[in-house]
């Protein structure tokens, strides 16, 4: 699944490719993907121009003249831009014909991606309603509210970091990486963490996600950015996908377990409770 760094990389690619382009045709082949109604979606966006491309957590914000398309890539979603003819592909589901003759295509092997069309004035309330936490950067992600949120929780730390309420954008890959870097067992109860451990998790979340953005995300399975290029963060991963390989800190073999139903990579030595 694309996590925050991958979605940010897609955002930057789309910003370069489609901002200023006018939508001259719309085709939706899988209506269920458009959660706010496919007929209104197709009618309302026709003739509007992509003014800017934003992001909130793992959500893309395709800002038009009057409205915003909120796009969630889910497991396998990606965008492709074709300058001329669009090839046949059963996994191409949404088509935005643009002035100048190019076509922006949404591809999704599993059809889990979603689109919602909202007035711009309702976008902020949308994310408040979903309880999406702050962006994982030094400006927005403050230590004190993070400490307070952990203290109130009855969840283990990995599950809590995945739920997006205390900090936005973390998924399975980067939670494993953050907890390894912070030397915290993924099965520790969040409310029992020491202040020093919480600060390490906080600081490593910011550091690792910013590094991943710089590297263009991790290419794991099917992820590519909106230019069709692989990211390179996978070359910097220390624990995710490294079952039975030696820990980079202590050489203990990395183990993979299930935490809250999610495959979880950790070092049983330097992340022990």
Curated annotation (Swiss-Prot):
Pfam families: Fapy_DNA_glyco, H2TH, zf-FPG_IleRS. Keywords: DNA damage, DNA repair, DNA-binding, Glycosidase, Hydrolase, Lyase, Metal-binding, Multifunctional enzyme, Zinc, Zinc-finger. Its EC number is 3.2.2.23, 4.2.99.18. The active site is at 2 (schiff-base intermediate with dna), 3 (proton donor), 58 (proton donor), 262 (proton donor). The keyword rRNA processing does not apply. One of its GO terms (biological process) is base-excision repair. DNA binds at residues 91, 110. It catalyses: Hydrolysis of DNA containing ring-opened 7-methylguanine residues, releasing 2,6-diamino-4-hydroxy-5-(N-methyl)formamidopyrimidine; 2'-deoxyribonucleotide-(2'-deoxyribose 5'-phosphate)-2'-deoxyribonucleotide-DNA = a 3'-end 2'-deoxyribonucleotide-(2,3-dehydro-2,3-deoxyribose 5'-phosphate)-DNA + a 5'-end 5'-phospho-2'-deoxyribonucleoside-DNA + H(+). GO terms for molecular function: 8-oxo-7,8-dihydroguanine DNA N-glycosylase activity; class I DNA-(apurinic or apyrimidinic site) endonuclease activity; damaged DNA binding; zinc ion binding. InterPro entries: DNA_glyclase/AP_lyase_DNA-bd, DNA_glyclase_Znf_dom_DNA_BS, Formamido-pyr_DNA_Glyclase, FPG_cat, MutM-like_N-ter, Ribosomal_uS13-like_H2TH, Znf_DNA_glyclase/AP_lyase, Znf_FPG/IleRS. Signal peptide: none annotated. A zinc finger (FPG-type) spans 238-272. Its cofactor is Zn(2+). Binds 1 zinc ion per subunit. Monomer. Belongs to the FPG family. Involved in base excision repair of DNA damaged by oxidation or by mutagenic agents. Acts as a DNA glycosylase that recognizes and removes damaged bases. Has a preference for oxidized purines, such as 7,8-dihydro-8-oxoguanine (8-oxoG). Has AP (apurinic/apyrimidinic) lyase activity and introduces nicks in the DNA strand. Cleaves the DNA backbone by beta-delta elimination to generate a single-strand break at the site of the removed base with both 3'- and 5'-phosphates. This is Formamidopyrimidine-DNA glycosylase. It comes from Streptococcus mutans serotype c (strain ATCC 700610 / UA159). The gene is mutM.
């Amino acid at each position: 699944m694309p996590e925050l760094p991958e979605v940010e990389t897609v955002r930057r690619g789309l910003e370069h490719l489609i901002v200023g382009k006018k939508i001259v045709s719309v085709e939706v082949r899988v209506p269920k993907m458009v959660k706010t109604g496919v007929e209104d979606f197709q009618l309302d966006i026709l003739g509007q121009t992509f003014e800017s491309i934003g992001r909130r957590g793992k959500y893309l914000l395709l800002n038009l003249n009057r409205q915003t398309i909120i796009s969630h890539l889910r497991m396998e979603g990606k965008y492709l831009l074709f300058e001329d003819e669009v090839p046949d592909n059963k996994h191409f589901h949404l088509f935005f014909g643009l002035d100048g003759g190019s076509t922006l295509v949404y591809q999704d092997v599993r059809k889990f991606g979603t689109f919602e069309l909202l007035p711009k004035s309702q976008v902020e309330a949308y994310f408040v309603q979903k309880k999406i936490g702050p962006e994982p950067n030094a400006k927005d992600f403050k230590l004190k509210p993070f400490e307070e949120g952990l203290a109130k929780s009855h969840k283990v730390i990995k599950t809590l970091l995945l739920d997006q309420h205390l900090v936005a954008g973390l998924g399975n890959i980067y939670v494993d990486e953050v907890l390894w870097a912070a030397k915290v067992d993924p099965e520790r109860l969040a409310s029992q963490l020491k202040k020093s451990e919480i600060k390490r998790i906080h600081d490593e979340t910011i550091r690792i996600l910013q590094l991943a953005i710089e590297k263009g995300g991790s290419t794991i399975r099917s992820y590519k950015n909106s230019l069709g290029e692989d990211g390179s963060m996978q070359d910097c991963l220390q624990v995710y996908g490294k079952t039975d390989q030696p820990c980079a800190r202590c050489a203990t073999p990395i183990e993979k377990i299930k935490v809250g139903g999610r495959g979880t990579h950790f070092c049983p030595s330097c992340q022990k409770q």
